[in-house]
Amino acid sequence: MTAGLPAWRRFAWVLGLLVAAGCSRGSGAVTPKPIEERLLKIGNAYRNAVRRLGHAPKDFQELKPSLEGDATEDLLRSPNDGETLVVIWGVDYDRLPPRPDNPYVVAAYEKKGLGGKRYVLRFPLGVKAMTDEQWKKAVFPPGYTPPP
């Protein structure tokens, strides 16, 4: 179909196809769940608060100035189970000694979760949906014991 076209027109035609394919709805982009967005917002604010304060925030009041937009305590409620999220306050996650077996440390989590999984904020910054089995193996900050 493009064999009789000059090289620049073939290039433009192929480029047009690639652009159209990249802009389609089926591009594979994943929309984060509200709980994931909420936990990431808390995680980013927590890290910013450590920089701003010079120490890890000890409670929501110290975290609040580092939050963008609406900074109400409703941010700490899980949209999945309706429970208050558990935030492990007072830990500077960037200063914890590295663990070669598992570099991720739990920083906040849903109390119950939904459908056999609870969403967990971990540092280095990320969110993971954990089964009960994964929860039992999760790494927590030194001195913190999670509920069963």
List the predicted regions and their residue ranges.
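Conserved hydrophobic/amphipathic alpha-helical signal-anchor segments
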Residues: 23-90, 94-96, 114, 127-148
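Short, hydrophobic/aromatic-rich segments at coil-to-beta transitions
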Residues: 101-107
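A generic fold-level signal
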Residues: 34, 100-101, 122
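Active-site and channel-lining beta-strand-loop segments
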Residues: 117-126
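Short secondary-structure boundary/capping segments
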Residues: 96-98, 119
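Sec-dependent bacterial lipoprotein signal peptides
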Residues: 1-21
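Small-molecule pocket liners
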Residues: 46, 104, 118-119
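Short, well-ordered junction/capping motifs at the entry into regular secondary structure
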Residues: 110-111
